[in-house]
Amino acid sequence: CSALTILFLYLTIVFFAKRLVKSSEDGTYTPGKAIAVFGSGAVGALAYCFSDTFWFSAVEGEVYALSSLFTAVVFWLILKWEEHADEEGSDKWLILIAYLMGLSIGTHLLNLLTIPAIVLVYYFRRHDFSWKGVCAAFGVSVAILAVILYGIIPGVPTIAGWFELLFTNVLGCPFNTGLAVYLVLMATALVWAIWESYRVIEIDGQLETPTIVSFVLAMALAGVPFIKESALIGILLIITMLVVLFMKKDVIPARWLNTIAMMVTVVIIGYGSYAAIVIRSNADTPMDQNSPDNVFSLKYY
């Protein structure tokens, strides 16, 4: 993991060096410029490689090596998106970043700190510089962090717990029935939201009522609006989303909703790595801290 981290750091430095050192008209570099570009990448990557902090995190059996790899990869991916942003299908890079973000949740939350940098790269690629725009980009990055940290991560087990209580305590169903129903409903809602938005894109790109309803339902079941595990905040945010989307349905492109729905879906898939914790706990291993063998104990794990 640490070796690959250095590789992606090298590629990142080379990317920025190429922006500073102009190539010839045919895209080639003179020997001196090539040494400057690739040499700067090698020097920067190797300097980080042999630094005390990185070296000793690389040789110990901890989560930081994999976390560093996720950090290096997602930032390199946003640079790849920046290169191909005007091409058709460039959103695939953003979706891959979201998937790796979801996977990184199961490793270490440190990787989420790349979100502000990623949002700024997106902003400077799509818009001209202005201080107002930069502040807005920072605001969007904070909102994305809040959605993941205080929405999706605690929201999924919280909503699963509500379903579990309903099906077990009220309806008298077997244990874990509510969890199974919730997972099926969430997956169905996400697929519906993606399909509806894609269907509209194929027609004229204008939002329709089924598109908005499916999107808001998918976001709700994914835990996005339930900030701090609060049902009241969740309901208010759901109503706000519905009002804004219906009022701005002629302005907001369906492609945005399609991309957001796919990104939330892959984040949930990556977040699913936590299923290993529940499976391991149900095996009654000798080391089983907090015994997270159900959705209620998993929430506080």
Locate each region found by the language model.
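Transmembrane-helix motifs of polytopic, lipid-linked glycan transferases
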Residues: 1-28, 73-77
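Transmembrane alpha-helical segments of multi-pass membrane glycosylation machinery
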Residues: 1-10, 33-40, 44-52, 68-72
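Membrane-interface transmembrane helices that cradle and orient dolichyl/undecaprenyl
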Residues: 17, 29-35, 74-94, 101, ...
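Membrane-interface alpha helices of multi-pass inner-membrane proteins
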Residues: 44-46, 93-107, 217-226
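Short acidic/glycine- and proline-prone juxtamembrane loop motifs at membrane-interface regions
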Residues: 53-64, 110
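Transmembrane-embedded, aromatic-rich helix segments that form part
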Residues: 110-122, 154-158, 231-238
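Membrane-interfacial entry segments at the cytosolic side of transmembrane helices
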Residues: 128-139, 171-181, 202-212, 230-233, ...
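Aromatic-rich transmembrane-lumenal/periplasmic boundary elements in polytopic membrane proteins
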Residues: 258-301
